[in-house]
């Protein structure tokens, strides 16, 4: 929704709706500072994309540019789905070749994220297994 100070009904934080545990994996431990810093949120988003791009590199290499159950698969769609539904959910989706209905905590399907966020340029995101927010 683009609101940096937003906390949703499940406790996800900021413009990109980060979970607290996810923030910790990229080096953010102060939620108040995070909510009050658009710059930190933007850096956190890039760090998480880098981490997820590393984690999902095999899936991206194998499936990018293909059509799976009617969905044109793109790197940006995969990265968005990983951010919004989790890396594990993305791995499960591709393990079952898109035939399982996988959804996030709000009931939004992973397929819809792949469609909605497909086709964006994410070539500038560098895969990095140890990506952290640099303050």
For every predicted segment, state its role.
Residues 126-135:
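Low-complexity, Gly/Ser/Thr/Pro-rich intrinsically disordered linker/tail segments
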Residues 5-6, 34:
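Acidic, Ser/Thr/Pro/Gly-enriched interdomain connector segments
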Residues 4-5, 71:
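Hydrophobic alpha-helical segments, principally membrane-spanning helices and signal/leader peptides
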Residues 20, 25-76, 84-92:
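Alpha-helical segment that forms one wall of the substrate-binding/catalytic cleft
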Residues 6-26, 80-82:
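Short, surface-exposed glycine/acidic/tryptophan-bearing loops
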Residues 68-125:
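Catalytic and substrate-binding regions of cell-wall glycan-acting enzymes that process beta-1,4-linked
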Residues 28-31, 98-99, 104, 134-135:
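Charge-dense, intrinsically disordered terminal/linker segments
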């Amino acid at each position: 929704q683009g609101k940096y100070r937003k906390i949703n009904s499940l406790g996800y934080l900021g413009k990109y709706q980060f979970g607290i545990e996810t923030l910790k994996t990229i080096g953010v431990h102060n939620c108040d500072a995070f909510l009050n810093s658009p710059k930190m949120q933007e850096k956190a988003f890039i760090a998480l994309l880098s981490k997820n791009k590393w984690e999902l590199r095999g899936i991206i290499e194998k499936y990018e540019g293909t059509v799976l159950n009617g969905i044109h698969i793109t790197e940006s769609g995969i990265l968005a789905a990983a951010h919004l539904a989790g890396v594990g959910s993305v791995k499960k989706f591709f393990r079952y070749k898109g035939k399982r209905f996988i959804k996030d905590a709000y009931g939004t399907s992973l397929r819809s994220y792949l469609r909605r966020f497909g086709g964006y340029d994410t070539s500038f995101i560098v895969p990095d297994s140890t990506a952290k927010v640099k303050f």
